[in-house]
């Protein structure tokens, strides 16, 4: 059996992991005016950012359907929409020259390529939860 002090330490570590908030904020893909999403890079957002946004600007009149992609951290989806649907752009949107699509997500790297990344806290938590009982109740 493990000494009582080691069991106590194991329980304390488990409690800290389960009860603490992650030390990092949201992670989003980040790029500006690119035509290829693979040029976007992961970025750690500010604590005030709550969504990852993906904005696609398309020229519907183009036979090639030219488009540009903007991906970013944002405080809210409404903030992104206000920015991209500003008075300046609304003239182009209303006249059919541009089409703007805004999508927002609340999970890490959801505005990028599928499977782009996972939270290190999820990995640490899964590892500790799977090893925790073995450490606490292991025999000599």
From Swiss-Prot:
GO biological process, one term: acetylcholine receptor signaling pathway
Primary localization class, coarse: membrane
Glycosylated residues (UniProt): 36
Superkingdom of origin organism: Eukaryota
Propeptide position ranges: 116-140
Range of residues in the leader sequence: 1-25
Lipid attachment points (GPI-anchor amidated glycine): 115
UniProt membrane topology term: Lipid-anchor; GPI-anchor
Subcellular location: Cell membrane
Cystine crosslinks: 28-52, 31-40, 45-73, 77-104
InterPro entries: LY6_UPA_recep-like, LY6H/LY6L_nAChR_modulators, Snake_toxin-like_sf
Keyword match Protease: no
Keywords annotated in UniProt: Cell membrane, Disulfide bond, Glycoprotein, GPI-anchor, Lipoprotein, Membrane, Signal
The UPAR/Ly6 domain, residue ranges: 26-91
GO function terms (MF aspect): acetylcholine receptor binding; acetylcholine receptor inhibitor activity
A GO-annotated cellular component: side of membrane
Subunit structure: Interacts with CHRNA4 and CHRNA7.
Function: Believed to act as a modulator of nicotinic acetylcholine receptors (nAChRs) activity. In vitro inhibits alpha-3:beta-4-containing nAChRs maximum response. May play a role in the intracellular trafficking of alpha-7-containing nAChRs and may inhibit their expression at the cell surface. Seems to inhibit alpha-7/CHRNA7 signaling in hippocampal neurons.
Full protein name: Lymphocyte antigen 6H
Biological source species: Macaca fascicularis
